[in-house]
Every structure is written in C-alpha cells, then in structure tokens.
C-alpha cells in the first residue's frame, strides 16, 4: 500500500475504531473501488484520477475512505474532486474527518477557498457539505447525462442531471471543524 509514513498523521478514536488520515503516495489503482463509489462515470474518473493529492482514512492498514484534493501551483482555490467512504463505514464521521484534514491543509497553504461539486439530486451529500459550512455557489445544468458519460439514474427518485458547486471560505472560518449533526459521509 502506498501510504506515506513521512506525512503528517492524525489519529482519532471513535466508535471503537482508531482512524488515521494520511497522504497517499501509492498507485491510484489501489483506490479504484472508492473512486467508483464516488463517481458513476468510469470515463470521468479516468480524466481526473491522477490529478492532485489524495488523503486516505485508514482503520489499521485498511483504507476505508479517500479525498482527492486538486488545485495548487500557486492557486488560491482548491477543489475536493473526489470523496468516498466505504459503504459499511458511512455515517461514522470518516468523511467529515477527511474534509477537516483537507481544509486544514489548504489553510496551511494559505488558500482562501475550498470548492466541491456534487449532484443536485443527491440531497444527502448536499446536506453533508452544508453541515460542514459549505455554501451553494452555482448550478451546472445537464452535467450528468449520457452525453457526458453518465448513465441515466435517479437518486431517491430525483433524476440525476445537474451539478451543484459549493464553496467554503477558509480565511478565519471554522465551520468545517464543528461537530456534525448527522448526515456524515
């Protein structure tokens, strides 16, 4: 496994599991299942999987979640490009911890904004990000269509079509660090 042992490691003990959040340095192929869980389009994943940096949540030696952070090279804005937690570990705060760690890293790099895009139909994920302090920024219509490489699906009966962009201001904001009230990834 390609987890960096030299990276800053944060450990949390929660619900009888000890989690470590670390920067991943291995082959992104090792994380294919998580990338597929985060995005319904294998073609889309292929275009961005190699970009940026990836944080992983580990329970022992097992990767249970990831967050891909893109942007850099002097840019003021970073983007959460991909975030997923194994289905059997969702709801335990793993996604929140990954976002908190990414936001902290962005603050240390003096970035002002953290962006994320998600499906407008996925109200559970929209709630998750808003509980962390992200705010609605804009809607990208027809981003998830067969023409853009996505299957025709519905989330909780809502057709998957539009992408919603959310932003989190990082200058002096601490919303991402506050305890979540449910809806955790």
Positions of predicted regions on the chain:
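Conserved beta-strand-loop-alpha-helix junction that forms the acyl-donor binding cleft
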Residues: 116-126, 137, 141-147
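Conserved N-terminal entry element of GNAT/NAT acetyltransferase domains
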Residues: 2-26, 164, 170-181, 185
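A conserved short alpha-helix in the GNAT/GCN5 acetyltransferase fold that borders
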Residues: 90, 99-107, 130
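Conserved GNAT acetyl-CoA-binding A-motif
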Residues: 106-118
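Short, P/G- and charge-enriched loop/turn segments at secondary-structure junctions
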Residues: 42-44, 150-157
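Active-site acidic-Proline motif in GNAT/NAT acetyltransferases
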Residues: 86-88, 92, 120-121
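Conserved active-site tyrosine of GNAT-family acetyltransferases
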Residues: 128-129, 134
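Acetyl-CoA-dependent GNAT
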Residues: 19-88, 96-100, 140, 169
């Amino acid at each position: 496994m390609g987890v960096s042992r030299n990276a800053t490691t944060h450990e949390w003990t929660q619900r009888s599991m000890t989690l470590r959040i670390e920067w991943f340095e291995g082959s992104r192929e090792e994380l294919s299942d998580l990338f597929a869980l985060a995005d319904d389009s294998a073609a889309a994943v292929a275009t961005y999987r190699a970009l940026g940096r990836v944080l992983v949540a580990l329970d022992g030696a097992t990767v249970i979640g990831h967050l891909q952070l893109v942007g850099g090279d002097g840019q003021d804005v970073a983007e959460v490009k991909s975030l997923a937690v194994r289905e059997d570990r969702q709801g335990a705060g793993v996604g929140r911890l990954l976002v908190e760690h990414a936001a902290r890293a962005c603050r240390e790099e003096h970035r002002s904004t953290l962006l994320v895009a998600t499906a407008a139909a996925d109200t559970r994920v929209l709630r998750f990000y808003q509980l962390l302090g992200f705010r609605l920024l804009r809607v990208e219509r027809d981003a998830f269509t067969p023409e853009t490489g996505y299957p025709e699906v519905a989330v909780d009966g809502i057709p998957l079509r539009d992408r919603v962009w959310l932003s989190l201001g990082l200058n002096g904001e601490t919303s991402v660090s506050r305890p979540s009230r449910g809806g955790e990834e």
